[in-house]
A protein has these predicted regions:
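Positively charged n-region of N-terminal signal peptides that target proteins for export
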Residues: 1-5
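Cleavable N-terminal signal peptides
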Residues: 8, 18-19
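Short, linear, compositionally biased motifs with a strong N-terminal bias
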Residues: 11-12
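Von Willebrand factor type D
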Residues: 21-155
Length: 155
């Protein structure tokens, strides 16, 4: 019985370690707004929220209609008026204040000189992008995007 419990405990610890190493890879390449015309810079200082960006259409998110959003350095897209909590990343469980928020890569990100936070509206979508953002205490950069489609879906 003790051997069975020990084996189960080791298997659980191994499983947790494997899960903590998970990397998400999207099904498509980045649209990459960095060299496109008509792109709006939403660069914000470290741990700050950008100015408001108009989506160019009404986006229904959990029963509420939105026409604008703002992004934060730490990988947050928020649809309400301030979204100030998006600027303060903590690894704690998410509270109810994160309603009407997408967290595509919620971590402590640093915007260096080569980094950019951009947005652009197209006829069928709006793209918010974080490019070459460095994680706190890490050397490598991350680039990711959120796409809001006019049919009220996102990826």
């Amino acid at each position: 019985m003790q051997k069975r419990i020990l084996c189960y405990a080791i298997a659980c610890l191994f499983s947790l370690d494997v899960l903590s190493q998970y990397i998400y890879e999207a099904n498509q390449s980045l649209i990459d707004l960095t060299n496109q015309s008509g792109t709006t810079s939403l660069n914000a200082a470290d741990d700050q929220v950008s100015s408001v960006f108009n989506l160019g259409f009404t986006f229904d998110f959990y029963g509420e209609a939105f026409t604008q959003g703002r992004i934060a350095t730490n990988g947050c897209l928020h649809f309400k008026t301030t979204g100030a909590y998006c600027s303060d990343f903590t690894p704690d469980p998410l509270a109810s204040q994160y309603t009407y928020t997408l967290l595509p890569f919620w971590t402590d990100l640093i915007r260096d000189n080569d980094s950019s936070m951009l947005a652009k509206s197209f006829s069928d979508k709006t793209v918010f992008g974080w490019y070459d953002m460095r994680e706190y205490n890490r050397a490598s950069d991350n680039s990711f995007e959120v796409i809001l489609w006019t049919n009220d879906t996102f990826e």
